[in-house]
Amino acid sequence: MLDKILSELITLTVDVGEIIMSHRKNSGNFSMKSDNTPVTQADKESNELIMNTLKKLTPKTPILSEESSNIPFSSRKSWDEYWLIDPLDGTRDFIDGSPDFCISIALIRNHYPDFGLIYSPFNKVHYYRLPNQSSIKVAGNKPHKISTKKPNRREKIVVGRYSNNNKPLKNHLRSKTNFETFKLGSALKFCLIAEGIYDYYPKFGRCSEWDTAAGVYILEGAGGTVLDLNNNPLTYNFREDNLSPAFKAAGYQENLKDKSTAAISFVTEPIEI
């Protein structure tokens, strides 16, 4: 099913991206939601187009979106399959004029992602993964497989631009050497690890499930891994609050047992938060 509608989903994200980019000059106009996160007109219009299109493409598949997430757990806990979307991931980055925002669409089956599509409207780049296939990057209409890379001597750790909970990482790396840290918004962090630009991404606070699902599936399809702090894979639609636990994402799995490296150790060693 997904391979048959992939081109339509890619076209959808391009159209949504144009909506988002048309609002960049007015990105400072936003309101705050009940969970104290910002929402813009771009979020709302993007959500409407994605929801309407998915309902036409897959009318029997329910949809859970950041901008329409008030579906009680009692109603959705029986879902075996559903779309999980963030129509504008990185709203704060968008508001602040950063290019680090994206559109994130995942299909969840039996509590795990089974399809992921992320589009960067600013860079006009797609990342996607079909079920049980390798992850693909599309830039300039040219698709190619991507894969994580073995870290160089200076490992590259990427964290959220607005993260206030990096103290555990700083404490953990205090005795380590040969690493650099970078700040980047949205689920694009998963994609850039998937193509070998960064090596690791620790998230020591909880975040919404629509923030992780597509990125997790894409990173895993490029050779990476994402685990919670108990070293278990992330699961979906088990919680009323739709929040993923703290996690750690790594690109190069073959090096997971080498605890001498700076950042890879946080994938294999327990970390107190």
Language-model features: locations:
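Short gly/ser/thr-rich secondary-structure transition/capping motifs
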Residues: 64-68, 140-142, 230-232
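DPxDG-like acidic metal-binding loop motif
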Residues: 73-136
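Conserved beta-loop-beta connector loops within the AMP-binding
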Residues: 141-153
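Residue-level signal for inorganic ion chemistry
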Residues: 20-23, 43, 54, 91, ...
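Generic detector of well-ordered alpha-helical packing
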Residues: 44, 67, 87-90, 94, ...
